[in-house]
């Protein structure tokens, strides 16, 4: 299993104070020196709430690890990434809403301009991945546009798992809709969410599409996904950076790697 470490929230902490620390390159090399991280993931958002263009340039210039850049189909971002001398190893196209706290679901594949954006990156020799819900129509869209990788949105699975097996439902930011469900309902919906991820991962595999997954994954809910044989890559960020605040980045990475690289 490939481990993609999302380091957006290293930069979130920097941007809160508009200062120079923590240094994103230091985080990069801590990750590299664990020998457990396979790629670095960053999200270049339209509102630049964390990662900035300058961060992209610095990372691509010196990173010993492949860089996966998540972004919307915004034309300015597409033009910027396509113009780079040092190219990312892949671009993952994600939906984006300026009012969201984090990405809320997979891409709407009927989105105007999506096909053109995919082609723009492909014409520059940049691998494209689509961040999609585990749905058959989305997979067929990927295949029709010669997309060789997809990343399944695991938010539904992760939220259900957290509601059932952690104290998430008792926290200040608990999801209201999940608080109203019984443990039996949560368990059934979680089982169905897992089965859907497994089914669509298998279908993607037979289409010749590499399957990645991410969103909301943490030290508790990630283990079940290892039972999906066609799943090749997990992109995880917030939970690792959250633990790093308490135990240090190296230890947080190693603990996650121990779970997913068995």
From Swiss-Prot:
Pathway: Cofactor biosynthesis; pyridoxine 5'-phosphate biosynthesis; pyridoxine 5'-phosphate from D-erythrose 4-phosphate: step 5/5. It catalyses: 3-amino-2-oxopropyl phosphate + 1-deoxy-D-xylulose 5-phosphate = pyridoxine 5'-phosphate + phosphate + 2 H2O + H(+). Its EC number is 2.6.99.2. GO terms for cellular component: cytosol. The keyword Cytoplasm applies. It is found in: Cytoplasm. The record marks 151 as: Transition state stabilizer. Catalyzes the complicated ring closure reaction between the two acyclic compounds 1-deoxy-D-xylulose-5-phosphate (DXP) and 3-amino-2-oxopropyl phosphate (1-amino-acetone-3-phosphate or AAP) to form pyridoxine 5'-phosphate (PNP) and inorganic phosphate. HAMAP family: PdxJ. This is Pyridoxine 5'-phosphate synthase. It comes from Helicobacter acinonychis (strain Sheeba).
